[in-house]
């Protein structure tokens, strides 16, 4: 969700098919480990049973489930996926993950080892052993999970939790400060 919000705020076109959807953490890491395979060799298929369970469209790329929570139909989700897939620049990737939805320390370690120069994982606490980890104090939903970073911190400031991260520097300098 954050990718769409940040892209919208910075007036950037959605150049990733992963905008407005989510993956389970272990499946997201598997997706990233074989990104070209999942993006360019797999056909997005509907998972009708999981869609019924979730109440929104769920797709499948081989062994990866893709949760399209902001779409009304699988057809609409697949159309947007394929449209944005054509815009992917494999030489200009920014990878973002959030410690939630069952994310484990093992998942964080696996994410940290991924061979991407421009990556960040927002975490519920400090993890000094992981270079890609970034903790926003107060953003914890509980001890093992980060709340929705698109939520406003309070009704007075107009600041969202994601505003505590310097997105412009991350996108321009391509590294964590």
Task: State where each predicted segment sits.
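Positively charged, amphipathic N-terminal segments that serve as targeting/anchoring signals
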Residues: 2-98, 103-104, 129, 134-139
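Short, Lys/Arg-enriched charge-dense amphipathic segments
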Residues: 36-39, 119, 146-148
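Short, conserved loop/helix-junction motifs that constitute active-site signature segments
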Residues: 88, 109-116
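Beta-sheet entry/capping signal
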Residues: 93, 118-119
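Short beta-strand/turn micro-motifs composed of small residues
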Residues: 97-98, 121-125
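Generic alpha-helical secondary structure signal
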Residues: 105-106, 165
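Short, low-complexity, polar/charged sequence segments that are solvent-exposed and flexible
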Residues: 113-117, 138-141
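Polybasic, proline/glycine-rich intrinsically disordered low-complexity segments
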Residues: 123-177
């Amino acid at each position: 969700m954050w990718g769409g919000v940040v892209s919208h705020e910075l007036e950037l076109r959605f150049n990733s098919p992963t905008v407005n959807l989510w993956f389970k953490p272990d499946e997201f890491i598997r997706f990233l480990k074989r990104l070209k395979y999942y993006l360019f060799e797999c056909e997005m298929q509907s998972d009708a049973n999981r869609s019924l369970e979730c109440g929104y469209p769920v797709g499948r790329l081989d062994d990866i489930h893709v949760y399209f929570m902001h779409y009304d139909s699988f057809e609409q989700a697949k159309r947007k996926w394929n449209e944005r897939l054509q815009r992917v620049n494999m030489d200009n990737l920014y990878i973002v993950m959030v410690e939630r939805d069952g994310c484990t320390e093992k998942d964080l370690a696996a994410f940290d080892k991924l061979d991407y120069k421009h990556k960040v994982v927002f975490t519920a606490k400090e993890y000094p052993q992981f270079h890609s980890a970034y903790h926003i104090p107060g953003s914890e939903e509980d001890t093992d999970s980060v709340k929705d970073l698109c939520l406003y911190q309070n009704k007075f400031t107009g600041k969202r939790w994601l505003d505590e991260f310097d997105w412009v520097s991350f996108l321009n300098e391509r590294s964590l400060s």
